[in-house]
């Protein structure tokens, strides 16, 4: 008990002394001026194999952020109170391991700090993210706290912004974040606003005012105060101070690491192409019990997502495979016209002709009289199962089946 009392007395004296030095003498614990930012450093592409990575350091606070891109089918499913919000396309996760503050303890599930800081950094970037039409990806950013001495959420905002740009996400503008503190005296006019507070100033101070934004405006604000309220001059000064600090961070540090988003996504990231089809043709692409779409996936190795309005996203790491899958989908959804030329495979031979599969789940028939220029007695004399042939569309017969001809294919198309 005696030791606890001694600690309480020491903490009260320390708090009183620190606040007095800041308020009266304008001396901060680390010797900085009231509007001075701690030493900064920024770097991108730390981890070579990930889709995007960045490191942001502010004094004794250091964050490493990693961005992962995925097709839209990988968006986070939300089961919350708002029935209108069922998915989340951009996810920012913040981790605060014990070693970042020199401690050792079990690493359990996310706590209030992890959830709150992650949500703040996530909201900070939402206004500048591209639309789904511009960038059809699900985006996940993970911020790992390597070292912590105040404002890790603001460092996470800076690191995740650079990581997104390094990953090739076409964000509209660069975003940075900074935190301001406050020490108050006996009267409303007796106060001092501090730029870029560290842990001790946060602990002994009266406010933690976090602001994120671009050169042109604010994207997110979070304020924690230990007093009953703030006057208008305090708020105005804090906002002005954070803007000045944000601009400095972006111009002098972040822009020198990466000035603008990469033109293309990382070579290891999945490539996504989008096309739009007639919603009435979705059933043709999917096929009975998914047979057609699964056949396309098996042949090309891509991933295909289709929405109810006919938007088709094809995702894969090989551009040629993506193009091949899109060609198959276009063939399946095409209203066949006389004279169109296709490449197909002989999948069935009958006495009267052969069936040619020219797209997954799509077949047409070549009558025996349309196989060769000369008369043939048996289809097998010219064709065998598995042969790849060029065919020209003759339209549809009375039963609605597609009719092909091999012999009428123009010579320059063979």
List the predicted regions and their residue ranges.
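Conserved phosphate/anionic-ligand binding catalytic regions in large, soluble enzymes, centered on
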Residues: 44-67, 149-170, 283-293
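Single-stranded RNA-binding regions, centering on S1/OB-family and related RNA-binding modules
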Residues: 268-272, 279-414
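Mobile "lid/hinge" segments at catalytic clefts and subdomain interfaces of large enzymes
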Residues: 164-263
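Structured alpha-helical segments in the cores of large, soluble enzyme domains
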Residues: 88-94, 98, 117-132, 164, ...
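Glycine-rich, flexible beta-strand/loop modules in the N-terminal catalytic cores of phosphate-handling
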Residues: 46, 51-137, 217-227, 231-236
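Single conserved hydrophobic/aromatic residue that forms the stacking wall/gate
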Residues: 1-9
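Flexible, glycine/charged-enriched surface loops at secondary-structure junctions
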Residues: 6, 23-34, 103, 128-138, ...
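Flexible hinge/switch segments at interdomain interfaces of large molecular machines
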Residues: 93-100, 132-136, 212-217, 228, ...
């Amino acid at each position: 008990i005696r030791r606890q009392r001694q600690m309480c007395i020491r903490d009260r004296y320390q708090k009183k002394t620190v606040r007095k030095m800041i308020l009266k003498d304008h001396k901060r614990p680390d010797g900085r001026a009231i509007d001075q930012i701690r030493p900064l450093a920024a770097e991108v592409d730390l981890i070579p194999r990930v889709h995007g990575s960045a490191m942001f350091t502010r004094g004794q606070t250091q964050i490493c952020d990693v961005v992962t891109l995925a097709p839209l089918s990988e968006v986070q499913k939300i089961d919350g109170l708002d029935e209108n919000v069922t998915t989340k396309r951009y996810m920012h996760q913040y981790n605060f391991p014990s070693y970042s503050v020199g401690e050792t303890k079990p690493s359990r599930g996310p706590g209030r700090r992890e959830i709150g800081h992650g949500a703040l950094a996530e909201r900070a970037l939402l206004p500048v993210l591209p639309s789904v039409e511009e960038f059809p990806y699900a985006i996940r950013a993970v911020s790992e706290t390597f070292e912590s001495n105040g404002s890790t959420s603001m460092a996470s905002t800076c690191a995740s912004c650079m990581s997104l740009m390094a990953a090739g996400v076409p964000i509209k503008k660069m975003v940075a974040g900074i935190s301001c503190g406050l020490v108050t005296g006996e009267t409303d006019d007796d106060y001092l606003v501090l730029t870029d507070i560290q842990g001790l100033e946060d602990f002994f101070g009266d406010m933690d005012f976090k602001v994120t934004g671009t050169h042109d405006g604010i994207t997110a604000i979070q304020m924690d105060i230990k007093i009953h309220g703030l006057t208008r001059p305090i708020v105005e000064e804090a906002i002005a101070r954070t803007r000045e600090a944000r601009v400095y961070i972006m111009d002098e540090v972040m822009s020198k690491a990466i000035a603008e988003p990469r033109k293309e996504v990382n070579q290891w990231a999945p490539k996504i192409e989008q096309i739009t089809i007639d919603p009435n043709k979705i059933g043709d692409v999917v096929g009975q019990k998914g047979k057609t779409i699964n056949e396309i996936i098996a042949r090309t190795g891509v991933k295909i997502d289709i929405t109810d309005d006919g938007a088709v996203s094809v995702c894969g790491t090989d551009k040629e495979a993506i193009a091949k899958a899109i060609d198959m989908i276009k063939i399946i959804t095409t209203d066949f016209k006389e004279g169109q030329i296709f490449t197909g495979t002989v999948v069935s031979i009958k006495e009267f002709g052969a069936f040619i599969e020219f797209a997954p789940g799509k077949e047409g028939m070549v009558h025996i009289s349309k196989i060769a220029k000369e008369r043939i007695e048996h289809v097998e004399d010219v064709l065998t199962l598995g042969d790849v042939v060029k065919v020209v569309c003759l339209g549809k017969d009375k039963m609605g089946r597609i009719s092909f001809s091999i012999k009428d294919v123009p010579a320059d198309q063979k």
